[in-house]
């Protein structure tokens, strides 16, 4: 690979793993965070005699594999499979030798210290990296927008967080986590389409539903007003991979409405607007105005059309009358965490934050907890 690589930035979420070169604009690779093992020995022969498959390859062979998701709700739950995912990412996707470059990893807010230490141990002992840093995803999103204060609504595949940050520091006591995100909307869309007579049940069919959601779903500015519109004004068509054309109507915004009314899918939790409001109210009274004026959307699940206007309207009803509210919705918010990490690795002040192999050898995995959180 090129000689001008200074560092590698890795953002692994529950749904997708993104990786690339520090200082570049976008991640070079992105693949599903899944690992598959052949169900039977005969299957191994049929699909190439591999012990396991990762990412897109696992997705394409899923009928013959037992699929595992190493990351659940933003937290690594299976380290054996996480190692396989990382090996695949370095050697098959990025095609780099990890012992040559410092590695910046992103992590979910509220990630247990023990998990952080385990990742540190794996990176130094299994992959022999020369240096490592682990940064909190929401902070990186904020950096990518040129801010050090604000509240980040980060919603990906299966977890949503509201994370207040002030002066670059995460306000841990004000974080709220919802185990509810994009995959829940995909399942709800499948249920709504079933009511229309279209059945999607298999893993591959659910990928089609995900594509329908990403292309056609939107957030209604006013849900009741949208529901009262004539049906034919809402309907559009979608061509399935087999050529069949289906009609989709109010499912497009009913699906996304679950973000604001989780009870629609049977969840007893607050909507995203209420979660933002509660997170802000848990902050010190003197900094709440900074939070309201810097509400940053991050993650693939915030890419829905109309979401920022709807959040603004809902918060306008909850916030004090004279409060300035600003929703920041970057067109790149799907990759905002990775972009923030890429920016961070280029800052001169950050270079002293890397944890070196020498430091690790001297202090062990706990060294990571002494430095993480400063950026």
Swiss-Prot record:
Assigned keywords, A-Z: ATP-binding, Cytoplasm, Cytoskeleton, Hydrolase, Nucleotide-binding
GO cellular component: actin cytoskeleton; cytoplasm
Species of provenance: Dictyostelium discoideum
Protein known as: Putative actin-26
Catalytic reactions of this protein: ATP + H2O = ADP + phosphate + H(+)
Keyword Magnesium among UniProt keywords: no
GO BP terms, alphabetized: phagocytosis
Protein's job: Actins are highly conserved proteins that are involved in various types of cell motility and are ubiquitously expressed in all eukaryotic cells. Multiple isoforms are involved in various cellular functions such as cytoskeleton structure, cell mobility, chromosome movement and muscle contraction.
One Pfam family named in its UniProt record: Actin
Lineage of origin: Eukaryota, Amoebozoa, Evosea, Eumycetozoa, Dictyostelia
Gene transcribed to yield this protein: act26
EC number: 3.6.4.-
